[in-house]
Amino acid sequence: MYDWLNALPKAELHLHLEGSLEPELLFALAERNKIALPWNDVETLRKAYAFNNLQEFLDLYYKGADVLRTSQDFYDLTWAYLLRCKEQNVIHTEPFFDPQTHTDRGIPFEVVLNGIAAALKDGEQQLGITSGLILSFLRHLSEAEAEKTLDQALPFRDAFVAVGLDSSEMGHPPSKFQRVFDRARHEGFLTVAHAGEEGPPEYIWEAIDLLKIQRIDHGVRAIEDERLMQRIIDEQIPLTVCPLSNTKLCVFDDMAQHNILDMLERGVKVTVNSDDPAYFGGYVTENFHALYTSLGMTQDQAKRLAQNSLDARLVKP
């Protein structure tokens, strides 16, 4: 079944480039940039990938991102991810990157973007993988800081298709970023947002009504609100669900409790994604395979999930 799932043409719509930084590449970049790491070797670092919640993961994620310093580093990071896409027949990807993670460390915005954009361009030309880049604001920072990031992005507007919202969800509702999202839409960007991962269904309502999103990233807690479920089904608002991430961060205690197939059967346009695959133990095919082994996902369900991902692209072929 793994090989069959791997061969299925699919799109990935919820992937943080910084979260695809495998320990081996992290150590190689640390050496290249002469950065001392708090871990002795790759295995010690991998053992640190045990999280009880979103915040514990984010603390490690930001520490790991510190090895990314030059455009070449960002190119290598993105290229390594694209090679995984090629292996798993991901024919289109819409990855996030978090500029504030890097600009707050003194890395110029264009250094980050140039490396990522060059790799995505090469990915299309050399690997046949199409893409659309999403600039994500960090929700634990202020809206004023998000505005500043949008200002930095505008000279490079052709490099992005959308803005998003990620990082620590609790206590940082989508409404906190309504003005900057209004402005981004006015500037011609599409919008997406993480909501309903650890946060309540109310955050999903806010993302839909205030941020006017095209897609909800995660959204698994929508099932707690029947009226919200009906709205998502009626309007066919896609959900970019990340099963391995959800179990690794204890959103669900184990995969057998995951609600993605329940949502699929109720008519929700759910998709399967890897989120931060280096940290959560699997890329897209591994996420599909986990649904097969733990939930008994059928081939028909897998085909529908893969088709949903292709249908929910912001960048249409």
Swiss-Prot record:
The keyword Metal-binding applies. Its cofactor is Zn(2+). Binds 1 zinc ion per subunit. GO terms for biological process: adenine catabolic process; hypoxanthine salvage; nucleotide metabolic process. It comes from Pseudomonas fluorescens (strain SBW25). NCBIfam families: aden_deam, PRK09358.1-6. The active site is at E197. Catalyzes the hydrolytic deamination of adenine to hypoxanthine. Plays an important role in the purine salvage pathway and in nitrogen catabolism. It holds the Pfam family A_deaminase. This is Adenine deaminase. The record marks H218 as: Important for catalytic activity. Its EC number is 3.5.4.2. Disulfide bonds: none annotated. Substrate binds at D276. Keywords: Hydrolase, Metal-binding, Nucleotide metabolism, Zinc. GO terms for cellular component: cytosol. It is an enzyme of class 3 (hydrolase). Zn(2+) binds at H14, H16, H194, D275. InterPro entries: A_deaminase_dom (IPR001365), ADE (IPR028892), Ado/ade_deaminase (IPR006330), Metal_Hydrolase (IPR032466). It catalyses: adenine + H2O + H(+) = hypoxanthine + NH4(+). GO terms for molecular function: adenine deaminase activity; zinc ion binding.
